[in-house]
């Protein structure tokens, strides 16, 4: 999912068929996307640098966090590279509906993680495990991923 929301209901050809017809049936070119990202944002866009290198971050081949930083409290992505900038623009990653959703998801997940930690400390592993399981089904998985990643940074 490009936007991180879990409303995937479309299959996108990452490299558009019009630009790469031989990749039409290439499994590595099929991405789950929400219909908004696929139809209204990306469409047939696939920007390239002057040397022909694709500018969109391919999350199946590289770590998006090398090009993007999620500002958790406001739910916005910040570009760390030209490729990150192109990815934000093409997919509309900072659309209001997404930034609000990520900000709310951050508050919710932070609260759930605090509750989980408290339950572990109180010796209640069963309820802590229930919270862990519920985190798997929260929208905006990119928020939880960023929280866990940033937790390990100095």
Which residue ranges define each predicted feature?
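Phosphate-backbone recognition surface of nucleic-acid-processing proteins
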Residues: 38
């Amino acid at each position: 999912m490009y936007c991180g929301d879990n409303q995937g209901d479309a299959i996108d050809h990452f490299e558009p068929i019009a630009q790469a017809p031989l990749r039409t049936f290439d499994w590595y070119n099929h991405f789950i996307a929400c219909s908004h990202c696929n139809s209204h944002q990306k469409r047939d866009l696939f920007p390239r640098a002057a040397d022909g290198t694709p500018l969109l971050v391919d999350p199946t081949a590289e770590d998006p966090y090398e090009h993007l930083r999620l500002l958790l409290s406001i739910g916005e992505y910040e570009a760390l590279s030209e490729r990150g900038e192109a990815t934000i623009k093409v997919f509309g990653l900072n659309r209001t509906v997404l930034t609000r959703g990520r900000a709310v998801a951050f508050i919710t997940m932070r609260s759930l993680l605090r509750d989980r930690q408290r339950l572990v400390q109180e010796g209640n592993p069963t309820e802590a495990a229930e919270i862990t399981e519920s985190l798997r089904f929260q929208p905006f998985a990119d928020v939880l991923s960023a929280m866990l990643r940033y937790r390990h940074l100095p």
